[in-house]
Amino acid sequence: MRNSNPGTGTVRTVVHEGDGLKISHVRQPDARVLVFSFTERGNFELAGDGFGGDFLLGNGFDVVAIKSARSSWFEEVAPVLPRIHAALDQAAVRYDLRVCYGSSMGGHGAMRYAAALGANRVIAISPLFDIRDPADTRYAEDIRLLTSDPMIRADGFSPDCDYVVLYDPRGPDAPHVARFGAVVAPGRLRPVRLPYSGHPSGYFLAQTGLLKPVVEALIRGGALPKLRGPAVARRRSSVYLYCLADGCLRANKPGWAAALLDTALDRAPRDAELLALKSRALTGLRDWDGAEAAARAAMAADAGNGHRQMLLVDVLTARGALPAALAVLDKMIGEAPGVGHYAWLRQEVAARISAAAGVQPQYWAT
């Protein structure tokens, strides 16, 4: 299907649509750079011009937007690669440069298919090598959507392509980048390390105003903007402050963590992740009132999230407010009666209450 925008010279062609995958080629007059963009995980919107589409087109680049409505890590792209090549052959545009671009799941797709798409350069933000890695279970729920084939093949990388990877070297993405380094040709992997930028690092770059200039510079082959600016610039990013606070907490410095989180919450007062981490920091300081208040605020900001409810149970249990913890668990069990862990934990809390009262606990089947 072909759709032209009168007055702009932009032509949109649907290359493939089906089974939750849509691929579109967007052409503009005189464009010499083609960017294959891969949508991020959780963005199931198949309409529009894809990941970063407005930005890419606004800078004069043509786009092949690869959009997936499934968290299948773009496994469904492999069978339709011939259609992409056929569409580009039919368009008969001689591009000087082909770039693959994506973040997280999209970064994985960019790395995985760059060679097959004839890309000269990859810009991958926080790409994962394999979600089956038992040491990293962040996306284990997506494994059921995969085939038995390897997610990454060692022979799937071009020695003529530069693979630029932006990531947090202090986070769980670092081992994935190391695995990419083992299969990319020597000298072709260009890591851009962004400490305390989290996953994916694009949020940090966006919050500091660096995402667009960095991506544009990488596409055009120019020098990168300064990525390690003054502390005041980094502190504009709640992601940076969260990751730095998490690092402080892991280093047993809860006071530092709490101070950093106060700064972050000044900018995002209802951010559930920030509130939850602050509750943990205040628990480390044994500030029980503050820890409980932060946990309740996190639960209110992210209603229905069992992790937030469990945090409140943990705080109440730690401060010895066992009847209050039991009341929260009763509410959780009423909302999700099939979660066996909740019933088990309720028995444990009830047993502690009974023991404190000198009463023999009663157990029942659940």
List PLM regions with ranges.
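The feature captures the conserved acid-bearing segment of alpha/beta-hydrolase catalytic domains
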Residues: 135-203
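Short coil turns that delineate tetratricopeptide repeat
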Residues: 235, 268-270, 303, 337-338
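TPR alpha-solenoid repeat register
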Residues: 240, 274, 308, 341-342
